[in-house]
Amino acid sequence: ADTIVAVELDTYPNTDIGDPNYQHIGINIKSIRSKATTRWNVQDGKVGTAHISYNSVAKRLSAIVSYPGGSSATVSYDVDLNNILPEWVRVGLSASTGVYKETNTILSWSFTSKLKTNSTADAQSLHFTFNQFSQSPKDLILQGDASTDSDGNLQLTRVSNGSPQSNSVGRALYYAPVHVWDKSAVVASFDATFTFLIKSPDSDPADGIAFFIANTDSSIPHGSGGRLLGLFPDAN
């Protein structure tokens, strides 16, 4: 099975798998059952921003999700990713719909990782920024229903004539692997930011968007749609 660390923007509470009974952001370590959550209210049709950061000295993974002029939701969890992730990973965005649906539109995405070892000269970093997405992106691995549209947006789940479709799952991963930790590293850190737009014709949108880090050969697990956000094969 894949090794996944994720930050979920969960628009549909699935209390049977441990979700709180409200929309929330959560930190997921190798399971859809979040280690930490905080209440979050999706604003239909508005552009929001998610920022995720990790620092190996503090060993803390944090996320903040906000809308312009609105309050922000923050969640953090203390974890040593060296013990969980392989040294080389890929980073991605994932989303799904179930019976209920929503658009899972990404307008921009940036990521920076830094790895400092004892030798001052030997610092590795990776940085990318997408302010828009090209029609046939060479630097993204698109999985499932993910596609880029003529407006320069990344649609993680299927949209037909502007309407979100049920039972869709899709992911986009950056093509280059990231050296996320090293046993000789003094500091390993990363920051990710993406802007998103969730819009739903349903009173209950579903299911959500996640930023995730996985083994480099990660693919969408069978049966991982809906509440599993395209990340996990089951709800354990």
From Swiss-Prot:
Gene3D superfamilies assigned to the protein according to its UniProt record, in alphabetical order: 2.60.120.200
Any Pfam family hit: Lectin_legB
Disulfide bonds: none
Residues at which Mn(2+) binds: 8, 10, 19, 24
Processing and modification events after translation: Concanavalin A-like lectins of the Diocleinae subtribe undergo proteolytic processing referred to as circular permutation. The propeptide is split into an N-terminal and a C-terminal part, the gamma and beta chain, respectively. These are then religated in beta-gamma order to form the mature alpha chain. The beta and gamma chains can often be detected in cell extracts. Residues 1-118 of the mature chain, as displayed here, probably constitute the beta chain in the propeptide, residues 119-236 the gamma chain.
Binding site for a carbohydrate: 14, 99-100, 207, 227
Miscellaneous comment text of the record: Binds one manganese (or another transition metal) ion and one calcium ion. The metal ions are essential for the saccharide-binding and cell-agglutinating activities.
Quaternary structure and interacting proteins, as annotated: Homotetramer; dimer of dimers.
Job description of the protein: D-mannose/D-glucose-binding lectin that also binds derivative alpha-methyl-D-mannppyranoside. Has hemagglutinating activity towards rabbit erythrocytes.
Similarity field: Belongs to the leguminous lectin family.
Protein name: Lectin CPL
Organism ancestry: Eukaryota, Viridiplantae, Streptophyta, Embryophyta, Tracheophyta
